[in-house]
């Protein structure tokens, strides 16, 4: 087993950015996220098999104390930085023993971005460490060291652990008070997800003391949560599988008569409130198994094909994924974006659910009936759209590769820059619900073109016919696709084309934008190869972040960085995984929150008559531009 001391702590960068932009590192509505970071570190000790209990105390002065019986933070001097490990962990951003996997196989808190952020956003932090038969104490004020590490007593050799007591700084939060209900919810979830761990919460304001301890984790948690509701099956469908780099466990059931459902997902015991690729994988695995079950038994009525939402409706689940190097959208870790999670979870769940359905055929048939009935309702509610093979109304553009499905709200149209990329996209798409229309070169700048004349442009005419909505029309009844996705290269030309298309939709198809139907796909600009591992980066900042992390992990080999010159350079499999697969892609919805401000900026950028304003803007703001070479 690896020794966990100061030289196991790796440093990536300083603490300065946190106070300037606290919202990038934590949820600033309340200090609950700070509590979660400290709790995560203690729970990581339990995950690694070093701690059996975690105690959380909310004091009357609104400070919070988290105590565990793990190994204790390192107190020896770091070989490169020349300060004790505990000081490094609390004063340097991205300092921790969790970047490589020597000290923790799976970890949620990066002893790093988390606990140093707690220090940066607190007026005072007091850390006590029991380790090597001594008890140590160190204090911090406003993110800086307030007192040196000192020995304050002796303890038994086996008496180890860490206590972190912090006072959140009210100026960084909308409300400086902890939400007790949310705190208790997180703590109960930790106990559920780490069977055998004892978690205690004490509120000194009310005298309340609660202890959670689950030997039968997910199953009993889910059963308790939906105890009063009719459910199918009666006992949750549970499963788990642990690989060398990832592990997944779940408990799920359906609530045929509805009711308040539980839908919770976690990565390395961190709640992912916005789901992510692991939840997408669970949904896909259940769908694949149910489709197979229905087809094998010939249960599907003619013309009915199960969609993900048919199986997902009225589901209650708890999903726990453990993986090395999870990637999240944003620092607050609320959505998992690691692409490999979707494939791992869907494969494991599909195999397990297929087996379970066939072993419990009677319940399987009831669940199939439920899904088929959901599909029937969906088909009845949605109008059908005639696809390209039907010749009536205006002829659809010849270059449109339409999808087969007839439900407009499920269908997606990708407007793809260039014919070569269009070819890759046609191979990468799911023909059932994804249509492709290649665009030749840059479209017309339509910002100042009158609504009646805009259709004179062949490209704009083809887009209007394909989507089924005329420029300027407010009636979206004939809309043929629920999502219209702009897919252009990640380089400067691609951004120009994407801007012109956004301008077209904002100026001439505004009701589409306001109804949330227009999206911009985010293809990666870089691919990073290191051995067998592949990482994709959206831009330079993400590329640098991945390279920094790989350097901190001290992985063998030199990373090979490839810059995609265009979508056509990606093979169909890469394009599908990074840009088109709903389980693993990134799509940004085009919204108009501040319509007046947005229209003013776009007018200044796109109107021919405002060249003078553009020049002034470039002179005053040109230094803020990102130059893409």
Curated annotation (Swiss-Prot):
InterPro entries: DNA_gyrase_B_C (IPR002288), HATPase_C_sf (IPR036890), Ribosomal_Su5_D2-typ_SF (IPR020568), Ribsml_uS5_D2-typ_fold_subgr (IPR014721), Topo_IIA (IPR001241), Topo_IIA-like_dom_sf (IPR013760), Topo_IIA_B_C (IPR013759), Topo_IIA_bsu_dom2 (IPR013506). Residues 411-524 form the Toprim domain. Signal peptide: none annotated. It catalyses: ATP-dependent breakage, passage and rejoining of double-stranded DNA. ATP binds at residues 4, 41, 68, 109-115, 333. Mg(2+) 2 binds at residues 489, 491. The record marks 442, 445, 496, 614 as: Interaction with DNA. Its cofactor is Mg(2+); Mn(2+); Ca(2+). GO terms for biological process: chromosome segregation; DNA topological change. Keywords: ATP-binding, DNA-binding, Isomerase, Magnesium, Metal-binding, Nucleotide-binding, Topoisomerase. Its EC number is 5.6.2.2. Pfam families: DNA_gyraseB, DNA_gyraseB_C, HATPase_c, Toprim. GO terms for cellular component: chromosome; DNA topoisomerase IV complex. PROSITE patterns: TOPOISOMERASE_II, TOPRIM. Mg(2+) 1 binds at residues 417, 489. It is an enzyme of class 5 (isomerase). PANTHER family: DNA GYRASE/TOPOISOMERASE SUBUNIT B, DNA TOPOISOMERASE 4 SUBUNIT B. Belongs to the type II topoisomerase family. ParE type 1 subfamily. Topoisomerase IV is essential for chromosome segregation. It relaxes supercoiled DNA. Performs the decatenation events required during the replication of a circular DNA molecule. This is DNA topoisomerase 4 subunit B. It comes from Pseudomonas aeruginosa (strain ATCC 15692 / DSM 22644 / CIP 104116 / JCM 14847 / LMG 12228 / 1C / PRS 101 / PAO1). The gene is parE.
